[in-house]
Amino acid sequence: MEFDTIAAISTALGEGAIAIVRVSGDDAVEKVNRIFKGKDLTEVPSHTIHYGHIVDLDTNQVIEEVMVSIMRAPRTFTRENIVEINCHGGLVSVNKVLQLILAQGVRLAEPGEFTKRAFLNGRIDLSQAEAVMDLIRAKTDRAMNVAINQMEGRLSKLIGRLRQDILETLAHVEVNIDYPEYDDVEEMTHNILIEKATHVRAEIAKILETSKQGKILREGIATAIIGRPNVGKSSLLNSLVQEKKAIVTDIAGTTRDVIEEYVNVRGVPLKLIDTAGIRETEDVVERIGVERSKEMMSQADLVLVVVNYSEALTNEDEDLFRAVQGKDFIVIVNKTDLPQAIDMERVIELAAGNRIITTSLIEEQGIDELETAIADLFFEGTIDSADVTYVSNARHIGLLTQAGKTIGDAIEAIENGVPIDMVQIDLTRTWEILGEITGDTVHESLIDQLFSQFCLGK
């Protein structure tokens, strides 16, 4: 597939030690060579790096001192010729280098266009392309490992095997329909068809079993910290984040809005949401914060309910416990450095079997136990299994769920005695749906939409 030559700054904008301008296309080397003073880049071997200068052809002025990497097709990320110009990391100089390249007839790349070309040129499939962004956005080592496994094609291989199983079954059905008179063709009975379709459904279900943990690793656990004012919610946020993100005072109602922060807890990304203290108030601004707190609580995957060890439970505390019933929650009894006034038996009753952690945040006690409880609640020690291929992308999960339903419809049709040639429709649809994950049967509009979410230069 032939494309024009594109270029973009591939490193984050801002001051830094190094910035990289990436150029990809059939004539990428020739275009860069025009403005490069040093070795003749058109004559150098592939996968080599060369020192020189970028020169403004109009003024013959040296613009930058650079190192230029030459990578020739097809052994490149895009399977096109790629040139990467390593500049100093100043905003002015790197933008000037980019402008000089564009002046040679090179087009500014769209967001994600380098990865899109890698997909369109067959270097990677669609699930691997999506994993590139997952790797960039990974917030923990475990999330990074999930993305790398997907980039290496683990999910693609699983999907490929399933599609091959369906394809072989479809071919067997076709032969039975078109050549029923041939004695050397194995008859595709309803029992054989059910066995093959059931195997595919079981494999899809097995992959989907990892989706909850995979999605958490990719997107994080939305965790709301709730409680009455001044029970230690902001102190808990600061302790988990290990820096002062929220203002902590003895004045009730200090936190008036929702504060969000990502934190790595035992390899699990937590999207921590410190909410305004929930209480009845006449303060208009605080009341808005309280309403937002209730909204965040309802949307959270996990709720940390904070109560005060040195105060008796109030009606507001008990209302909070009732509000979180049916959700995953952990109770934090804070301020254990102060004399006890809380009824712990009542706390145990309200917790209804959920974990209770006692903390003294001012003395930094109880945080390790809380972090362990959070990790155990969602992963139960299974997350470290190197053999598990996690499915974490919402698009993939939706397609797998859809494929599972379609193959289920096929099984139901077979069991009801529907003719085999009619069952073929559901089998074909399942094969197509699974192909959308890897991009084998995907619409061009979806491809454009997916790659538009990438950052510029990737």
Curated annotation (Swiss-Prot):
Keywords: Cytoplasm, GTP-binding, Hydrolase, Magnesium, Metal-binding, Nucleotide-binding, Potassium, tRNA processing. Binds 1 potassium ion per subunit. GO terms for cellular component: cytosol. (6S)-5-formyl-5,6,7,8-tetrahydrofolate binds at residues 22, 84, 123, 458. Pfam families: MMR_HSR1, MnmE_helical, TrmE_N. CDD domains: trmE, TrmE_N. The keyword Hydrolase applies. K(+) binds at residues 230, 249, 251, 254. Mg(2+) binds at residues 234, 255. InterPro entries: G_TrmE (IPR031168), GTP-bd (IPR006073), GTP-bd_TrmE_N (IPR018948), GTPase_MnmE (IPR004520), MnmE_dom2 (IPR027368), MnmE_helical (IPR025867), P-loop_NTPase (IPR027417), Small_GTP-bd (IPR005225). GO terms for molecular function: GTP binding; GTPase activity; metal ion binding. Residues 220-379 form the TrmE-type G domain. GTP binds at residues 230-235, 249-255, 274-277. Its cofactor is K(+). It is found in: Cytoplasm. One of its GO terms (biological process) is tRNA wobble uridine modification. Its main location: cytoplasm. Its EC number is 3.6.-.-. Homodimer. Heterotetramer of two MnmE and two MnmG subunits. Exhibits a very high intrinsic GTPase hydrolysis rate. Involved in the addition of a carboxymethylaminomethyl (cmnm) group at the wobble position (U34) of certain tRNAs, forming tRNA-cmnm(5)s(2)U34. NCBIfam families: mnmE_trmE_thdF (TIGR00450), small_GTP (TIGR00231). Belongs to the TRAFAC class TrmE-Era-EngA-EngB-Septin-like GTPase superfamily. TrmE GTPase family. This is tRNA modification GTPase MnmE. It comes from Bacillus cereus (strain ATCC 10987 / NRS 248).
